[in-house]
């Protein structure tokens, strides 16, 4: 094929209940893009019924598409290889193979999740965004680092779209339920307290869903339950995006996926980005949900940069992780120019995290820092006050508690509950993140020993990242706002998973060396074998579908 000319690719999307066919050129012009959604008659999506829908609908859409772009003009066939429902993926792959063989054109299978990111970049001004991808089957925070799109954060159980749809079905709303939840939420005026579960840059939604169902069953107004469900879940999503932003130091945030159509979620993220002084992007609604154009576009990007597939390589991968894809279409040179920005920290602060502003000062005669958990404009007042106060008190308590376990921590000088401030001793040193970037890994085994001591004492940090250790003559642990007491092996396993993913996201080139040293140190904890085994089980449950 002559790749010097403008190529035309047809894309087939069929990972769940939406059937999409799109045609796009290599200069980004969308020639055709149409999606038809399967609406189940009663309950949720049955995989076989969704697959039957694809088999019928692909034929109709293909006929319509080829009236716009003649079949002889198609240069490339692309399809969603995964992740998704097995039966749906198989029908999609079969359709793409059949067309590829009949017109004798190359075929490319692409990652569904990354397709959302790349079509979003095409349709906005985003260059290097941190992406929140939210849909019926996926909830991920993605960032490009080191030739891959890394999963920085995600749901530990169900996806946000699934959460909203399950709640809607419980309340006898039509499918897709998220639209109706949003509609009812607009008329809600009472905030009902529901579980709020953030663990580092991950969230859990199953407990929230169960609690919301119980509130509905207890005769709370449906408008108020929908309002509270949205405020809670979307605040959690916005928070983990903000945490990932602080961790990766990106200067752009992009929202993609079917749930990106929700106006309240867009509003929350927009407010957060303004507060963090970064740019926010959302593609047009047509390109937020599943569609064929995004599949075709990623197919073109991969093909033009050397990707080739044999028919034997086109077997669907239902658990196709974003970070399994080698990104061959982004040049590292693109990230060495003035177009790629980093998040800017205000001059009067020495640090600005996802939760707090950090300033340096003097307390009596001692060097100190003040950590102020600032108001979050994206959260409603009732929820924001509750979270900020609870985490301020919790952090002070745990900083004192870990000292009893022989772990170094800053000394607390003052707690201002009203303004959600903690003043503590200033630690001279560097955060672990900086030490690792310099290539100094000598302290990493100590991190594992420290975590083992915490777990031995029944303390789970819940936000272990390389930004929450300060290395000087000794290693100090900070930022216990999400901490809790727990003897559950799974809680300790998730603690390590949070740290593992934070290391992988920005220290990917040193991951093996860093992680092996940490685990070597963690083996000083008597229950290390049980925790490490549990880690494997939890990682298998991670949602990529």
From Swiss-Prot:
Chief location category: cytoplasm
CC terms in the record's Gene Ontology section: cytoplasm; EKC/KEOPS complex
Keyword tRNA processing: yes
One Gene Ontology MF term: N(6)-L-threonylcarbamoyladenine synthase activity
Biological processes annotated in GO: tRNA threonylcarbamoyladenosine modification
EC number(s) per entry: 2.3.1.234, 2.7.11.1
Cited InterPro entries: ATPase_NBD (IPR043129), Bud32 (IPR022495), Gcp-like_dom (IPR000905), KAE1/TsaD (IPR017861), Kae1_archaea_euk (IPR034680), Kinase-like_dom_sf (IPR011009), tRNA_threonyl_synthase/kinase (IPR009220), Tyr_kinase_AS (IPR008266)
Cofactor(s) this protein requires: Fe(2+)
Enzyme class: transferase
Co-factor remark: Binds 1 Fe(2+) ion per subunit.
Binding site for L-threonylcarbamoyladenylate: 133-137, 165, 178, 182, 262
Entry keyword Lipid metabolism: no
Active-site residues annotated for this sequence: 463
Region (Kae1): 1-329
Domain Protein kinase: 344-545
A Pfam family: TsaD
Keywords in alphabetical order: Acyltransferase, ATP-binding, Cytoplasm, Iron, Kinase, Metal-binding, Multifunctional enzyme, Nucleotide-binding, Serine/threonine-protein kinase, Transferase, tRNA processing
Location of this chain's protein in the cell: Cytoplasm
UniProt catalytic activity: L-seryl-[protein] + ATP = O-phospho-L-seryl-[protein] + ADP + H(+); L-threonyl-[protein] + ATP = O-phospho-L-threonyl-[protein] + ADP + H(+); L-threonylcarbamoyladenylate + adenosine(37) in tRNA = N(6)-L-threonylcarbamoyladenosine(37) in tRNA + AMP + H(+)
Residue sites binding ATP per the record: 350-358, 371
Binding, Fe cation: 112, 116, 133, 290
Protein family according to the UniProt entry: In the N-terminal section; belongs to the KAE1 / TsaD family. In the C-terminal section; belongs to the protein kinase superfamily. Tyr protein kinase family. BUD32 subfamily.
Record text on subunit structure and interactions: Component of the KEOPS complex that consists of Kae1, Bud32, Cgi121 and Pcc1; the whole complex dimerizes.
HAMAP family per UniProt: Kae1, Kae1_Bud32_arch
Described purpose of this protein according to its UniProt entry: Required for the formation of a threonylcarbamoyl group on adenosine at position 37 (t(6)A37) in tRNAs that read codons beginning with adenine. Is a component of the KEOPS complex that is probably involved in the transfer of the threonylcarbamoyl moiety of threonylcarbamoyl-AMP (TC-AMP) to the N6 group of A37. The Kae1 domain likely plays a direct catalytic role in this reaction. The Bud32 domain probably displays kinase activity that regulates Kae1 function.
Protein name: Probable bifunctional tRNA threonylcarbamoyladenosine biosynthesis protein
